[in-house]
């Protein structure tokens, strides 16, 4: 995929010039879209992802927000160690590499890192997967073929070197055509060798237990 970078005094924005023809930092600001009625759904999660109607097409905006006790001190600031090492730029890189390897992930449209003193704030805008619902919502109506295809998809990701930091039933999507996708690659890594799936699958199955999903776990393990 194409990639260009906008550089400001304390701001860097990665963007796809094939989809985003005019770069504006406001596109990464939830308030900008709320004021203009561009928010079509609130998708929840700690980052409170927003589904948007943008000039680049339907998209999902997610700001990087902290959780736990540290959020009481700083809910959206991280120590700055370089633009390329920001959460948004690392996620952009992971998505780009996975797309190059033909894997089903949302296409990144924009990613920003804004430095403020020793800290930074960041956000990412990705293409919306139309008509998709999460595995958490769809698990009860899946057939054996669906579980087979999900298992095959996960094995493709593992073989491609993907290390997902939060593999759970909410981060796996099924679209209207029956295609599976993975989302939310914050803190993900893409290795130059196959990844060990054990811990990722353990995390996924813990989310199954929490949500009361039984499913065909045996079909998700190689």
Identify the role of each PLM range.
Residues 161, 166, 184:
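Conserved catalytic-loop position in the HRD/HxD motif
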Residues 167-174:
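Hydrophobic residue at the +6 position relative to the catalytic HRD Asp in the kinase catalytic loop
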Residues 90, 149, 203:
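Charged catalytic carboxylate motif
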Residues 25-132, 155, 159-160:
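Conserved ATP-binding subdomain of kinase catalytic cores across diverse folds
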Residues 145-153:
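Conserved alphaE helix
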Residues 175, 179-222:
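C-lobe/activation-segment region of protein kinase-like
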Residues 1-40:
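Juxta-kinase regulatory segment immediately upstream of eukaryotic protein kinase catalytic domains
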Residues 133-142:
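AlphaC helix of the protein kinase catalytic domain
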């Amino acid at each position: 995929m194409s990639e260009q970078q906008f550089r400001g005094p304390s701001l860097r924005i990665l963007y796809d010039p094939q989809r985003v023809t005019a770069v504006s930092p406001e596109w990464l600001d939830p308030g900008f879209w709320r004021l203009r009625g561009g928010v079509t759904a609130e998708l929840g999660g700690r980052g409170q992802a927003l589904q948007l109607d943008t000039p680049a097409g339907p998209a999902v905006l997610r700001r990087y927000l902290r959780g736990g006790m540290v959020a009481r001190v700083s809910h959206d600031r991280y120590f700055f160690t370089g633009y390329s090492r920001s959460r948004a730029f690392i996620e952009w890189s992971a998505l780009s590499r996975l797309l190059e390897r033909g894997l089903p992930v949302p296409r990144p449209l924009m990613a920003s890192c804004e430095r403020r003193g020793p800290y930074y704030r960041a956000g990412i805008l990705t293409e919306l997967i139309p008509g998709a619902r999460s595995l958490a919502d769809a698990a009860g109506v899946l057939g054996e073929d669906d579980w087979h295809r999900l298992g095959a998809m996960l094995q493709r990701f593992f073989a491609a070197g993907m290390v997902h930091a939060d593999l759970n039933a909410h981060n796996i999507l099924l679209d209207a055509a029956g295609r599976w996708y993975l989302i939310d690659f914050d803190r993900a890594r893409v290795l130059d060798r196959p990844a060990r799936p054990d811990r990722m699958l353990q995390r996924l199955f813990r989310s199954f237990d929490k949500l009361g999903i039984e499913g065909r776990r045996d079909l998700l393990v190689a």
